[in-house]
């Protein structure tokens, strides 16, 4: 059975591997730009959600922007009969833009309050376990509106806890924690994106902030499925997320960790085990596009990398700097 960890100073006990749910909504596009991970039939999405429950996953991370709300809709429909046994994490602040880009950022009080109401409806629930801003604050006005919205959301019982998804804006994450604005912080961290996190982890421990790792498989680049030279189709958001040089550089880096793969563990399992080797981490939230892939991810909860392997990983990462 998958292990559980406490989410910071909250009273939430989360499966140390959750399910990132971006892909569950299927294909969507804005201004001819894909904002999904390709097609996914609703039946496949429901099969993955049901399998997650069977495997012991109790935490599902989504956002109102994911497939323009369809990820939330599918989750709400599939999980409404077991609401008390699971945790819904969702996010707001990324807004579909029909001008010259796929999205804009809106962290205003009115937008966040309206967004959580829409998410509650799509998720078919009367409360959300963790409501997060989806983008980092850009100004003092943003910090102020976030504080006001989070206070209202909690006092009205619409969310039990509030947090921020800051991607790789680590200093912003530290500032949010020091101001006492967040119960959790979601950020990027993986074998090929190791990041300087010692200060952030130290502040999180001091403030009791739960750490959620997004993209622990680097959007699939650590699964072993994609080799240097791979090009994602236009229907996949990854086609637009990276220029080709950066994509190929990340894929080349991923090949340096093949020594972690053996008959007892896959590339994905090794990558997730690396994340879970950090006690500061409460949960990582890889996505999955099949039940088979999901089951493989869950098995990482039973794997531990050796001290020698962790040291070799550290040496490889330091050589990149």
Q: Where does each model-flagged region fall?
A:
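Beta/alpha (TIM)-barrel catalytic core signal, keyed to glycine-rich beta->alpha loops juxtaposed to Asp/Glu
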Residues: 137-321
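A short acidic, helix-capping loop that chelates divalent metal ions and anchors anionic groups
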Residues: 26-31, 95-102, 293
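Active-site groove signature of glycoside hydrolases
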Residues: 120-139
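Alpha-helix N-cap and loop-to-helix initiation/capping positions
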Residues: 33-44, 70, 103-111, 141-145, ...
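Hydrophobic residues in well-ordered beta-strands that form the structural core
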Residues: 61-62, 75, 88-90, 164, ...
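N-terminal binding-site loop/beta-alpha segment at the start of enzyme catalytic domains
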Residues: 1-86
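A short, structured active-site edge motif that brings together acidic residues
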Residues: 85-98
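Short, acidic/polar
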Residues: 39-52, 107-123, 168-175
